[in-house]
Amino acid sequence: MVQTVYKNSDQTVFEDAKALFQLNKNILLKGPTGSGKTKLAETLSNVMKLPMHQVNCSVDLDTESLLGFKTIHTNEEGHQEIVFIDGPVIKAMKEGHILYIDEINMAKPETLPILNGVLDYRRQLTNPYTGEVIKAAPGFNVIAAINEGYVGTLPMNEALKNRFIVIEVDYIDGDILKTVIKEQSKLQDEQLIQHIVKFNEDLRTMTKQGQISEEAASIRALIDLSDLATVMPIERAVQRTIIDKLEDEREQQAILNAIELNF
């Protein structure tokens, strides 16, 4: 399978992220859902040839989800013993890999201070379950992603935010979007791809005007739309991938109007 890479007409987005990575700075990718933040992190992982350990944040995220947990293990002699299973944070630190924290502002603020020492010059933490002091191996880097203003998100603690350098990641469009659709979906029909790109421009305009939510204009939704367009009429593909996800009837009607204009 061909490895897809992050693309953006603003080349400084990736160039700056790579430069910050090489300086061992914590990177906070900030942008709307589906704008390619995870793809950018994955591309950095591939370019730097470092594996990536991912944490998916939610209100249910706890210290065990970050650091790991104790469990009972049967050793080679057949005796049971209590062992600690490393979680993504500790794995990344010990191996000198990348730690990617997705939707970091979905986590409860009281869950994240355990990472303060990981994110500052110390690059270390004390495992509260074992007492072990863990210092990050060379190569360890932290990338986090944030979606601001969405349901379920919480204001990011200023002390935590100050440990990162922010890079804005906006939606892609135009020729770059055409290339992404061709590379990441099954759709290869140039004319239909052009119509989808124009349709996306209308969605983004409506998003900026507050007529529809940003989720409706996500790159992820467009890739799904393009895939479905190879097996069903484009109108039904839009219905399945975008319209049916929306609760507001006015948003649904606005997108139906955009379909009539573009297809």
Swiss-Prot record:
The keyword RNA-binding does not apply. It comes from the Bacteria. GO terms for molecular function: ATP binding; ATP hydrolysis activity. Gene3D superfamilies: P-loop containing nucleotide triphosphate hydrolases. It holds the Pfam family AAA_5. The keyword tRNA-binding does not apply. Keywords: ATP-binding, Nucleotide-binding. ATP binds at G31, P32, T33, G34, S35, G36, K37, T38. InterPro entries: AAA+_ATPase (IPR003593), ATPase_dyneun-rel_AAA (IPR011704), CbbQ/NirQ/NorQ/GpvN (IPR050764), CbbQ_C (IPR013615), ClpA/B (IPR001270), P-loop_NTPase (IPR027417). PANTHER family: MAGNESIUM-CHELATASE SUBUNIT CHLD, MOXR FAMILY PROTEIN. Belongs to the CbbQ/NirQ/NorQ/GpvN family. This is Uncharacterized protein SE_1092.
